[in-house]
Amino acid sequence: MEEEIAALVIDNGSGMCKAGFGRDDAPRAVFPSIVGRPRHQGVMVGMGQKDSYVGDEAQSKRGILTLKYPIEHGIVTNWDDMEKIWHHTFYNELRVAPEEHPVLLTEAPLNPKANREKMTQIMFETFNTPAMYVAIQAVLSLYASGRTTGIVMDSGDGVTHTVPIYEGYALPHAILRLDLAGRDLTDYLMKILTERGYSFTTTAEREIVRDIKEKLCYVALDFEQEMATAASSSSLEKSYELPDGQVITIGNERFRCPEALFQPSFLGMESCGIHETTFNSIMKCDVDIRKDLYANTVLSGGTTMYPGIADRMQKEITALAPSTMKIKIIAPPERKYSVWIGGSILASLSTFQQMWISKQEYDESGPSIVHRKCF
């Protein structure tokens, strides 16, 4: 037995849950944040049907289940299902006893206070963890990039945030949230593929479209020009084989889909695009720190994985910012998991060890201790 017990790091996203051990360089378990319940009564006796399935098992049985996501727009909305996901994480994915390990959880920026308390309560009362901590996702992504100052544009499956951070502290007055993320882009791709004559409607088919999106979509540097290219030649067309063997062809949809990040009007939304939201977030900060934010704009989350997104961000923010400003967009290759990686780094710092909320402190102060110790 090593002299120190490894901390567990769990990053609960709207789309995927990333879990593993502090000090590891990547999460051991990555599975969909889904809980599925059977749609039909089981007819086979002795089949051992369960009343609920979590993660990949729910995904593989999706044809007979109703799938629910307990985390919407980055924030937990269904605590019973969330508890099932945590239970699955500890016992089935990581195969650990939660009462033996400190647990580092992540939360969305601007997470309601009651939610942090509820997370704390479940960890100590349901899972009996010896210690826990709740960290803000974007701050962890910044740590993972080796910085303590910068602005993080974190875009996952359910929500996008721009979070300016100065010397390790998020600046809450300048955090902006955009309810436009991966799931919306998947829905949009479903819609524009329907216009091509391919029909995708069920939750199971949505997963196929998500795969098409992840494999074939990219961000155009110049949207109008790319549209013209797509119209005049077939050079941008790619084919994709569906599970039943049918092959579909996809052309301008490849870049029209993620273009909605820069032009939310494509989705019928009135909000600003991710470039403008990032700029607005910077402008809400003190004039003296803006220079540091422009030069340290870090992309994080699965929805920033499109090829071409960093160049396009650079171009768009350069157009908005003062002309002399040095602008640098940092897009680490591991950014899909940078929140988790930042958590792993944090949990293994010697200086962090006194930051954990212990079971004893929780027993003395109750769930509100989380506001005093995690900021």
From Swiss-Prot:
GO terms for molecular function: ATP binding; hydrolase activity. The modification Tele-methylhistidine is found at residue 73. It is found in: Cytoplasm, Cytoskeleton. The keyword ATP-binding applies. PROSITE patterns: ACTINS_1 (PS00406), ACTINS_2 (PS00432), ACTINS_ACT_LIKE (PS01132). In vertebrates 3 main groups of actin isoforms, alpha, beta and gamma have been identified. The alpha actins are found in muscle tissues and are a major constituent of the contractile apparatus. The beta and gamma actins coexist in most cell types as components of the cytoskeleton and as mediators of internal cell motility. PANTHER family: ACTIN (PTHR11937). Polymerization of globular actin (G-actin) leads to a structural filament (F-actin) in the form of a two-stranded helix. Each actin can bind to 4 others. This is Actin, cytoplasmic 2. It comes from Anser anser anser. The gene is ACTG1.
